[in-house]
Each structure stands twice: as C-alpha cells, then as structure tokens.
Amino acid sequence: MDTFRKWLNKPKADDKSLLARFYHADRSLTAVASELDSFDGRAEPDRCTRLVSRLRQNQDKVLAITNMIMEELLGEDRDPRAFRAKFPEEVLQENLAGQLWFGAECLAAGSSILNRESESKEMRPLAQAVTKSLGHVRVLLRDQCLRNNVPNSKTLHLDFNDSNTEQLYESLKIFDHLFAEFELSYVSAMVQVKSRHEYEMQQWIGVLFSETLQRSLKVGLLDQDMVDAFDPGLMFSIPRLAIVAGLVVYAKGPLNMDMPGDQLSEMFRPFRTILIKIRDLLRNLSKQELYQLEKLLCTNEDINTKVPLGSSSIEAPSPEHNNSSSTTNTSNNNNNNTNNNNSSSGSDCTNNDKTGTTTNTHKPVERLVDHRNNNTTNSQQTSSCSVNAAATTPATSSRTRTPPSILSPSAGSTPTASPAPSPTPSHSIASTSSAATTSTNSPAHWSDYDDDDEDDDDDDVHADVEEDEDESGILDSDEHDLNDDSDSEVDEFFEAQLKAIVAAVDCAPGYLIPDCASGYLISNTNLGNLLQPQQVPLTDNFVASEDDELGNPTAVDQQQQPQQQLEHHQQQLQQQQHTEDEPSTSAAMLAARRTLQRLRLPSSSSDNEPSSNNQQMTIKSPSEQTTTRSSSNRHRHHSHHHHHHHHSHHHHHHQPTAAVAVAAAQDEQHNNNQPHSHSHSSSHHHHHNHQSHSHPHRANRSTRKRCSQEHCETITTTKTTSGGEQQTEDSLDSSTASSLSDDVSLAMRNTTARLKFKSTENLLHRLFVCIAGVADQLQTNFASDLRQILRSVFLMNMSSAQEDIDIPEKTKESELFEFRASENDVIQESAGSNQSIYSAEEVNPELDNVFNTNTGTNGARHSAGATMQRNNTIDLATVQSSNSGNSSSSNSSSSSSAARSHVARSRSLGDHDQASTSSSQQQQRELQLQLQQQQQQQAQMQQQLQRHRNNSVGSNSPSSASSTSSNSEHNSPVSTRSGSRRRLPSNTTTTLSTSIGTAATTPTGATTTGVTTTTTMSPPAWIPDGKAPRCMSCQTPFTVVRRRHHCRNCGGVFCGVCSNASAPLPKYGLTKAVRVCRECFMREVRQSHSHGQSQSQIHSPTQQAGGRPQAASAS
C-alpha cells in the first residue's frame, strides 16, 4: 500500500517545486553512476570520459538543490563559512560543490592528491564521513519527495511533527558541518590559503601602493585624472613604482629585505634574492637617476641623463669639461701620441683655471672611475701611487681651501679636468660614479640623502669644500700628529678589505676586455647575466652575484702569480696594451677609500683621535712613518703646486729639490732590488711603466716609485713589522672589527656592483628590465591579490565626488522662458503683431532714457502714437484721450502730454512686483494686462486661420498686406498698436476701443469689472532626465544618439519623433512656437480652431461694415 501511494505521489516532470527538482536530479545522477559501474572504463575511455562529465554536472545540480533546501530548512543553524574570504577568487566558482563531492569520493576510494599525499591521508576519514552523510541525506530527501511534495510550490511543506522530518533536519545539519569542514581542508590542500599574518602583510602592501601613488602624484610622475579615470596603464605603473619605493624610500616597510624571508609577503617572497640585488643597485643611484628610472617605469620613454647644471644631484659637465670633450672628439681621429701630449698640456691649463671656479666637487672626486681618460701620460702612473697620493692630499689642500678634485694627483684624469682621446658622452660622468656616498647610508636615512643633494648647486667654492669634508670625514687640521697604533691597526684592517676588492676587480688574468662603445674595461666575470639579451627569461640569477667577484685573498694571490709571469714575458705587448686601455684602478681605489674613511670616522672620533695633517688612509711601516712626518713638513709649502701639475711635469720639466731627488734615487735603487712577489697587479703595472720612462724625467719617476713602494709596504705590513707591533695588531678590538667588516663588505660590494655597467643608460635599463619583470610576474602569479590591492588604492586616492548643487527654483516668469528674444526676433514679420510678448526694451535697453528727456521739447515726437518706447502699456483712459485728441490738430500737444502722463512703464514681465505700490494703479494695470492678453489670443487665432487660408488659396491676406504696408518705425508691438489706433479715422466702426469693448462683452472673455483670471499660467515642471529612461509616448529607451526632449505644455519627456511638433502656448506666456508633443499639439490645434470660429463670428458684422479694416488702418 505504501509503495502504491508513493507511485501515485511521484513528482511530474514539469513540477517546479524544490522536492520535485531534487527527485529528478537524483534519479539522473543514479542512472549515470549505474552506467559507469556497468562497464570497464579502461576498455572504453571515450565513453567513460563522457559519463564522468555528465556525472560531475549531475552532482553539481543535486548539491545546488540540496543547498537551497538547507537554506530554507536550517536557516541560521547552518554552519558558518567565513573561511571563504581566504579563498582566491578563482576558487569560488559555481561548480565548487561538485568538485568537492568528486574529490571526497576519490579520497574515500583511496586516491590521493598529487604531491599532497600527507594531506590526502589526513583528509581521507573526513571524506568518507562526507560521502556517507550525503548518501543518507539523499535517501531522506527522496522519501520526502514521495510523501509531502506539493506540486509547483515555491516553499517546502513538511510536517515538522513527523519523525522523518526531524531525522531529515538533523541529517542536514550533520552533513552541512562535515561538508564545510571538508571544503576548508580540501581547498587549503589544493591552493595556499592566507594566514592572519599574510593578510596583515597584504594590507601593508596596499598601504605601500597608496603611499607610492601619492608620492608619484606629488612628484609629477602621474596625474590625478588618470586615477579618477582608472587608467589601465596605472595597473602596471603602480606596482613598478611601489617596488622602487619599497626598496629605497620606505625601506623599513613591507619590502624590507633585511627581515627574514618567511616574514615577507607571499607576493614578494619568491623574488627576495633579486629584490636584494635591485636594492643594492638602487642605493647607488643619485636623486636624478632615481627620478629618471621612475619616469622610465611609468612612461617607457628614453633615458635622458643630460641634466643641466643645478637641476639635480648629478653634477652636470662644467664648461671646461665641455670644451675639453669637444676637443677630445675632434682629436680622437688623429694620432694618439700627438693627442696625448696636447691632452697633458690642456689638462694643466684646465686645472689652473678650475682652482677657484669648480663647484660641487665632492661627487666628481668619487667619479674618478672614468677609464677612458687614461692616455699615455696617465698610464705611466701606478695605481698604488694614485691611491697613496690621493690619501695624502686632503690635509694639505685644506689649508688653501682648494677642492679635493683639484688636489688629487689623478685630477688630470678626471672627466672634468683632462680631455681624453676617446669619445666621451656627457652622461658618462654619472655612469661611473661610485656608490661611496649612498651605499653606507641606512635605508631609513634615504630622505636625508635626498636633502643633501638639494644643496649641490652652491656657487661658493669654500662652502662646497666644507660640505665635502664633512661628508667624507676629512678633518681640517694641520697641527695634529699621525694616527696612533690603534688607528693604524684599524686602517690596516680596512686596507686588507680594500686589497681583496682591488685584487678581485683588477687582477684576474686575461679577463679584461675593452668596450668600444664606452671605452671601459669590463671584466667578463662581472658581466654575468646582467648584460644578457632581453629575451632571456627572468630568473633570480639575472643580476650577477657580487660574491663571485670578491672571492678570497688566497685565490686571488694564486691567480696573481701566473699573471705576473705572463706579463713578464710579454712586456712590450703589455706596455702598449696598458697605454691604450689601462683600467683606472686608482680611481676605483680612491672611491673605495673614501667609503672606508667615512666608515672609519666614527671609530676614530670616539677615541678623540683626529686624523693626521696629511690624512694618510693607508697603513705604513714604522720606518716609513718618521720619514713621512718629516717629509710632509718639508714639502708643505710647495705640495699644492706639485698636486696641481702632477701630470704636467713631463712637459714643464719641473725639477724637485736636490734632497728629494737624492732620496728618490735611493728609493729607486732600493726598490729595484725589492721582490715583487707580494705586491698586487698595480705594482706590476708600475714595473712596466718604470721601464718605459724617459731619462729627462727620472726625478718624477723616482718620486712616483717611492710612492708606490710605500704603498707596497703598506699592504705587507704584517711581514715587515716587529713582534711588538704584531702584538698590537692582535689586540685590536674584535667587536669593532666585526661590526665594521659588515659595513665595509657591503660598501665595497655596492661600489664594485656599479662598476660592472658601462654607462648610466645601461644601468637604468637593466634596473627597468628587472623591476618590470618582477611587477609583471605579480600580475600573472598573484592576479587576484593585486586586483584587490589596486582596487583599494584607486578608491582611496580618487578625487572626492562633487556635491550635488541644489538649483533654486525659478521665481520670475521671465526666467521660465526657454530663450531670450534677440532684436531680429522682435522685428520679424510676425513679431510686430500683438502676439509677441518679448519687449524691445529687453533687446535694446539703451532706449530707457526716452522718459528722461525734457517733456517741454519735442512733445509731438513723444506722443502716445508716435513714440518708439518699448515694453510700455497704455490704459483705457490713455487710449480714449489719445483717440479724442486725434480729431483736432490744435490739441495735439496737450493730448500727447496728457497721454505721457498716463503712461506707466513696466520694466519686464518678471518685475511687476517692483512697480508702483498704489492699490488703484495696481488694479488698473492688472485689468489692462488682462484685456491685452485676451486681445492677443483673439488676434493670434485670427492670424492662424488667415495663414491657413492663404496657404490653401494662395491669395494675400489682409493681415499680410497690413504688415507689409506698415512703416518700419512701427515695428515694435506697442508702437504698431498705438500707431494704428492713432491713424484710424473717428468715423470708422472698428476702432480698438470698440474692439476691446466687444471682446470684453463676449462670452469667451471676461467683463471689464469682474476679471479674476491670472495674466499667465506658470509652465509645468519638467520631469528630470534620470526619471525618464524611456520615451513617454513610444517607450523607446534613450541612448547617446536618441536624446530626450521636453514638451513645454505637459513637461513630459519624449524622443525627437514624438515631439517634433511646435505650437505657441499663450497661456504660459510663450507666444512663439515651442516644442510640444503630438498629443499636446493636437489639443492646442483643436482649441485654436474653436477660438478661431468664435472670433470669426464676432468680427463678421464689423468686416461687412468696414470692408477691409486692416487694409484701411494700414493706409
């Protein structure tokens, strides 16, 4: 019996109730599952694939209906799913439930997720519980479909007192809880779900993006209009700029590369290695170079580092350098030997000229890395002598207040002092600048670095020297002794670090290649992937690691010996090669030494141990210290002259003193016997240069030889010092050495990292490729997160919406008109009749002074009939007196003066309330306006009928004849009316007064004494455009092309087709034809015909008696 009842209650196929839909979906799913179990899927893979696809679709359908049933039955008792906020947008799809069911069945059957075996093992019991609970729910729902189904019911009609219903309720709650738990576990295993820390980091990244956008708007890289318009280009520009700002400007923010990798955001964690290398290169950029990079990231424009003087922190080429550069480009095509001699002479003159005029010399002294200025004369100077002399000159130069770039012995090879035979673009000055100024600054003090750059344009040489000495840590003192043993040991520690850097950069055998484009010598080992083609995919190793070039000193020494042996057998070839392409190791050493000195300054100043008067930055042996102290005092008076002409000695034959020559000769003899196995490549370069010297310059050669020997002994201090001094070195504070070692290594790595690039354009272009590559990968790998961040950034930084301006309602009738009549509109053929309400005074207000003229003179001209006054009204008394005065010519002046006395001027239709406040005059004026309105309506109807009659017959109407015969001086409405009244004979039957009287006694009009109607009605309010998306007649939707039109009669909104009619609306004061809809047009036309018929009946006897009154009045 129960089975029979269920068969009878089986839902129909067209039943739309929830239970019926579930019943049929469940039956279809069962059929597909049975078919899948009926054959071997490996034998028929195509059929199996189709059935699996159908199975997934049916599962989605069954779970969707089950979810709706749970929503209605459980309501608020459903298990919360707030964890879905952690899911990416790609996961939250409509078929997510079906995927979860399919995954639960696979896990319950023993399958595992690929590469997630451990997670699959943990989820397997939960998956089995989910499938078992879902099967039980399906059975109970099928039973309810056969018991309590109401066909086509929108709600469930279940008996809650039934035990089966309560069982279904509890089963649904259990299934909902298990399915929610399995959803979180399964999705977390398939995709990475963010933790609380990751959400906080993502919010900080959003703050970084917002700060970057505001900074870009302030600097001028972006426009506010682009933000308001949601420019798609900002989707790429903002992440790129945020990477630069996060690494440099806001270095303590979410892109702080000093924090552990696991604390970084998930978005930037895969790029941590490359971001660290980008940060190191960004810190070497000046303020202008950073701006050029950011501009390149925004606009992809060409890089332009040619900045005029004083515009940025990059020092522009001085006039002397521009002249020398032009000389260089000209002389480059000639013989190199001849140009070398001329270059040395030009260098001497330039140095003399630049003594008191060079500005901003702190950065040029760090830009001594220009390898292209090493001509034949400069190649004879060893790098060790350059470094040692560069370290000894600042103290001497401090007395004469001369910029360090002039006092340096390598000043002849600086870009601003010496013309070079190789082509030198003007932007190459900054391309080889050292990172000594910025590499040691902490990221938090980047703003201080920017502020310092703003003061680079001072024209005072002394102020620049003081600023440079303060920044570089050079003390301006001549009275202090040399550093004590502790400072010497600290310097020795720095020198050991410096030795490793120079050895790694300069002593690699056979790895120096000339770069023809820039004149640099770039090591092949330093190129790495930095100079690889742009088509190479972005990896973490596309920036060469600086650790590879540093190496250890032992490996460098092992590579040094075969190089020296090879160069010893090829002296002539090496001499020519060094003459043409020698790398400026001394410049790199000088830039590195300035960085070391800046690092050493806090430690030496803390012990109140000022630097010596000659500011030695290298460590000397004890025997050399006494000699240096005595020789510094002996050469103090002429050291400035020596440093200025260091490279011009060969041409001016400046001979040193005898004592210096003897000492130099002795040192030369001693150095010839000195083994060179412990010196680095710069000493070996000196060996070859020594053999290439000429005899007349032996004294200068000896001096340089002695200088080189001092530096050689400096590097090998530990081999030449005594046992007591060795113990002093061992007593160096280990904590200070370890703390300074990190700073020194960081500074040296940053300095050498920039030397790998042949120009500033190459550096900026490589940074652009790197930063753009990281930002573009964010667009691909983290598209959902990036969209959410950018959406928030746009909403936070877009301009505030303008407040709705409340337009006050128009109170004056004159402002309700759609347009103002011009003078041409007033004097048209139809405007001269009574239908025009636009006064000529509004068009030509200069005639207001008509009433201000003398009433005693020209009285006849200002009579009521002959005046040109505009917008004036005449009452009945005035008309009567005017008509009576026309009977005799003797009383013309008195009648005209009487008429003027009764003329009341009204300024405009909207200014009636500003007229006379007298009650009697106000009532009289209202009566006159009412009569005139009735007369205008009657005349308009008659004219319309006459116009229609003329159009159909083709004859000239009396009105047209009257209008054409009227004089041009009576074109205004008032003058036409008054003139016609004045010219009518007294015996005519159709006078204006009788017409007015007739109109006043007609049924359609109002009596003279009892008129209560208003002059004009206020136009209807227009329906706003926003409330009328469709035409109110044809219901056609409005588009950009199909515009809205308002009917002036009803205020409705219509399309152009439904409102193409036009008709005058006298009841609203609109006597000219205006736009009306078709319905209003038909209604107005019917009214016009009815009024025309009544008007023709009124005037028919008058026309019979008077013949053609209009023609008579015109005559």
Curated annotation (Swiss-Prot):
Q: Which residues bind Zn(2+) 2?
A: C1047, C1050, C1077, C1080
Q: Where is the composition biased (Basic and acidic residues)?
A: 363-373
Domain of life of the organism encoding this protein: Eukaryota
**Which stretches are tagged as biased composition: Low complexity?**
322-361, 374-417, 425-444, 558-577, 600-614, 658-676, 714-726, 733-742, 881-901, 921-975, 988-1020, 1090-1100
The keyword Zinc appears for this protein: yes
According to the UniProt entry, which residue ranges have a biased composition of type Polar residues? 615-628
Q: Which cellular components does GO assign to this protein? A: early endosome membrane
Q: What's this protein's name?
A: Lateral signaling target protein 2 homolog
Q: Which organism is it from?
A: Drosophila grimshawi (Hawaiian fruit fly)
Q: What is the lineage of its organism?
A: Eukaryota, Metazoa, Ecdysozoa, Arthropoda, Hexapoda
